[in-house]
Amino acid sequence: MSISSRAISFGSPLLRRLVFVAVLLLCVTGSANDKNNKESSAEVKFSAHTELVMVPVVVTDKSGAHVNGLKKEDFTVLENGSERPIATFEEIASQPERLIRRPTPNMFTNDVTSSGRSTRRITLIVLDALNTPFLDQTYARNQLLKYLSQSLDRHEPTGLFLLDRRGIHVVHHFTSDPQVLIAALHKVMGEPLQGSDSPGDLALATGTTNPIGSQTGGVSGMAGSPAVPTTALMSAVSSEAAAFQTLVQDSALNFESFQQRVAITYTLDALQQVARAVGGVPGRKALIWAGGGFPFSVSDNTMGLAPAGRDTLSDVLPMYEHTWELLNEAQIALYPVDVKGVQPNMPNASDDLSTSPGTTGFNNYLRSTSYRQLDTQSTFESFAAATGGRAYFNSNDLVEGFRDAVQDSEQYYMIGYYLDRSNTKTGWRKLAVKVKRDHVQVRARSGFFVTNATVNPEINHDSDVATALKSPLDYTGMSLAAHWDDVVAGKEAGKKSVRFIVHVDPDPSLIDTTDDNHLVLEFVATATTPTGEKAGEPTGKKFDMHPKPDALATIKEKGISYRGALELAPGEYNVRIVVRDGLSGRIGSVAAPLKVD
């Protein structure tokens, strides 16, 4: 589900709340609950492919130093409490090697190479302006600049992204020189999420003022009108005032749920795009998420997505579970950093916040703010543990979190085992890694989702392709290159047919040898103007084939190419080319700027 950010920024604050009540109520339906219940009780329908689960494992001593020399026999992997045989094992000591794109005129590629062997270390940083108060955004940028200027290795592959209400943006690509990143950070300007309105609106929404009278409890009408001290009239006015106040509070809660749904969708979408951008690069990646908190809560035991106020979010669950799938496939460890710094003491159960008349709504607001802070910390910790990272909050020194994220990826173990296919129950599978060594600390992701949406790539086909086409990031699920070919007269007057060729590098994993060498590749290309408007019609083709021996040998040796064309009028365009593997769901994409004379 994708909702335009413009939908939450028009009109007066109170009008916005009231208008979107109806929209929100349409989003929250009983049928969504029914679908979710059916999905929870359904069995997983595995394909014929074996599922290799890769788990990066960080093992340190009490001082935090990496423990070297462990063997495969020293490790035990448990899935839902049952031991699984380790199929692959490797100890990795990574070096800060620059990732470099291969520059060639009129050649656009998503392939990245390193100076030596395949790079197994990337640090990614997301500044979350969508879910972060404006003042805290400035603090986060200053802390990040402090880390980059003092600690960053100039060879360390580092990517910086900004998330705001327009989506995810690339500030610095991980193939670029990290020195450029320091200069670029000075130019990053955060944009806060549409938040609290005027003090009067906040008071109205939280019940700190009487919406039709004074706060003194007197009854008044228009300015200058005397109070009418009749019991019946006072009772009627009080009743209407209470009803109206309830309506306003109800509308505010409904709008807050709607606004939260938008933030959840944008946040999950950003996580998916970042995971896709590094999914084709081997090794563990550290993702530092610097923000004021995720816009959702999760359960520690099931990692299920908790309701957002009155919104059950049932229809968002597939997107949430798919996000986990992509994070795990990309071997991303999440390091959430709460940029709000040290927080003041929060109210507890012993605090008396309910005795003063007229303060009920405000006290509820204080309580909800405090619990949101606790919720932020809990969700950050859950996400960090589930991915093998660490969470940092309630600190005025964020540099530690940035530094630890890089250090954890310097040395680690990569363990692989095959998924337990005898368990066909959908849901969260707990994962535990144990080491037969005393006085060591082991950190690995604590689980993963197994649902039909995660094992059947076709379920997310449409949303995956649509996101890839609009994303500013090149996806690296498969290595590809594209170039512009010749230009001929178009079928429509005033337009030209611009031909292009896309080449997918040889990749044995694209071919299913157990199904008569089955190969499924889908090519799609779209063009937009510099302002983001659609230009012309998308073009593409899907290949679903079982190549004969001669053709198969050529594909294995040289890869496979596709020739397409876009019908465009003269002008400048941003073209996005996407290639999707229909068997695994992997995606490769590349941007190819174009000027048509």
Segments the model singles out, each with a brief description of its role:
Residues R6, L25, G213-T216:
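N-terminal start and proteolytic maturation junction detector
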Residues S31-D597:
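Scaffold/interface architecture of coatomer-like assemblies
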Residues M1-L15:
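N-terminal secretory signal peptides that target proteins for export/translocation
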Residues R17-V28:
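Bacterial N-terminal signal peptides
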